[in-house]
Each structure stands twice: as C-alpha cells, then as structure tokens.
C-alpha cells in the first residue's frame, strides 16, 4: 500500500503545482 500512498501524494503534488 506504500505505492498507493505515494501515488496519492504525487497526484496532489501536481494539482498544487
């Protein structure tokens, strides 16, 4: 589930940018 957590952060990171 670590990948899922990182995936969520990555998606939010792009949205914030």
Swiss-Prot record:
Name the catalysed reactions: a 1,2-diacyl-sn-glycero-3-phosphocholine + H2O = a 1-acyl-sn-glycero-3-phosphocholine + a fatty acid + H(+)
According to the record, cofactor stoichiometry and binding are noted as: Binds 1 Ca(2+) ion.
Q: Which UniProt keywords apply?
A: Calcium, Hemostasis impairing toxin, Hydrolase, Lipid degradation, Lipid metabolism, Platelet aggregation inhibiting toxin, Secreted, Toxin
What would you give as a GO molecular function for this chain, any one?
toxin activity
Q: Which domain of life is it from?
A: Eukaryota
List the GO terms this entry assigns under cellular component, sorted alphabetically. extracellular region
Q: Cellular location of this protein?
A: Secreted
Q: What residue ranges are annotated as transmembrane?
A: none
Task: Tell me yes or no: is Manganese among this UniProt entry's keywords.
Answer: no
Q: What is its EC number?
A: 3.1.1.4
Please give the cofactor(s) recorded in the UniProt entry for this protein: Ca(2+)
Any single GO BP term: lipid catabolic process
Tissue expr: Expressed by the venom gland.
Q: Summarize the protein's role.
A: Snake venom phospholipase A2 (PLA2) that inhibits collagen-, ADP-, thrombin-, ionophore-, adrenaline-, ristocetin-, and arachidonic acid-induced platelet aggregation. Inhibits serotonin release. PLA2 catalyzes the calcium-dependent hydrolysis of the 2-acyl groups in 3-sn-phosphoglycerides.
Query: Which protein family is named in the record?
Result: Belongs to the phospholipase A2 family. Group I subfamily.
What is this protein called in UniProt? Phospholipase A2
Organism this protein belongs to: Austrelaps superbus (Lowland copperhead snake)
């Amino acid at each position: 589930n670590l990948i899922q957590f990182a995936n969520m952060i990555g998606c939010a990171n792009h949205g914030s940018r």
